[in-house]
Regions:
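A short secondary-structure junction signal
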Residues: 39-43, 69-70, 128-130
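Short, flexible helix-coil linker/hinge segments at the edges of structured domains or between repeats
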Residues: 1-22, 74
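Conserved catalytic-core segment of NTP-binding enzymes
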Residues: 1-9, 66, 93-115, 120-206
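N-terminal phosphate/diphosphate-binding loop that engages ATP/GTP or pyrophosphate donors
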Residues: 47-92, 161-163, 175, 183-191
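NTP-binding/hydrolysis catalytic cores, primarily Walker-type P-loop NTPases
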Residues: 197-227
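Gly-rich Lys/Arg/Thr-decorated short loops/hinges at beta-loop-alpha junctions or inter-strand turns
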Residues: 24-28, 81-89, 140-142
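Walker A (P-loop) phosphate-binding motif
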Residues: 12-64
Length: 227
């Protein structure tokens, strides 16, 4: 890559921005903590979607200023990417998180992708705004699928419980280091009744599962060749 001068924000964040995803399916990647495998999972899902012929736009909604994650999304095939620093925010909070998410969802959807994938940096419990975002009824209403990244089966159990009981969200899949071995996968599937795939060893299975949950399994790989 060739570096370019850093600039925070190409436009100001509107805290009253409306949300309109124009019917585009949305996949959210949440985690039990930082470094739980969210970016790896998002990248694997994006790569599989591109392989299947889908046009994918992606963004990172929360965390601290670091473009590495969205560069990974681009390397995996995302057409357009954004991060909260594009809106002048260098560290997200409970106040800015929902507005940032609405703004980036709306902007991504305006390009009419087949699907939007976004990562919620930090864990479900933290100070960067993830909890605030997942409490917003309008944002929850547009989430077609939520994938949970967890470091171990105990974290997976707690994360699934939080999503279900605190936020009223049913995760479609668990990934992350908790799925690094067959024992972890079996525990998640049997004790939590949630599908589990590893983003590193089974990226195609992870991506295909999410695509099926979105109802986009009919898209033909030949679409890529036609672009």
């Amino acid at each position: 890559r060739i570096g370019v001068p850093a600039k925070v924000g190409y436009k100001a964040l509107n805290y009253d921005a409306p949300l309109d995803v124009r019917g585009v399916p949305v996949v959210a990647l949440a985690g039990t903590c930082m470094e739980a495998g969210k970016t790896a999972a998002a990248s694997a899902i994006i790569a599989r979607m591109r392989h299947r012929g889908l046009v994918v736009d992606a963004f990172k909604a929360t965390g601290v200023s670091l473009r590495r994650d969205i560069l990974a999304f681009e390397d995996s095939g995302a057409r357009h990417t954004m991060i909260f620093t594009d809106l002048g925010v260098v560290t997200t909070t409970a106040k800015s998180g929902p507005a940032l998410t609405r703004t980036m969802l709306t902007e991504m959807a305006s390009g009419q992708p087949d699907v939007i994938v976004f990562e919620l940096g930090d864990g479900l419990l933290g100070t960067y705004g993830v909890e605030s975002i997942l409490r917003q009824p309008d944002i929850k209403a547009v989430l077609t699928a939520v994938a949970l990244s967890a470091n171990d089966p105990v974290a997976a159990w707690g994360g699934v419980k939080l999503l279900r009981e605190r936020f009223g969200i049913e995760p479609c899949v668990v990934t992350g280091p908790a799925t690094d071995n067959a024992v972890g996968v079996e525990i998640i599937r049997e004790q939590m009744n949630v599908e589990a795939f590893n983003a590193i060893s089974s990226p195609a299975d992870l991506g295909d599962h999410v695509i099926t949950r979105l109802g986009l399994g009919h898209v033909r790989e030949s679409k890529v060749a036609a672009e």
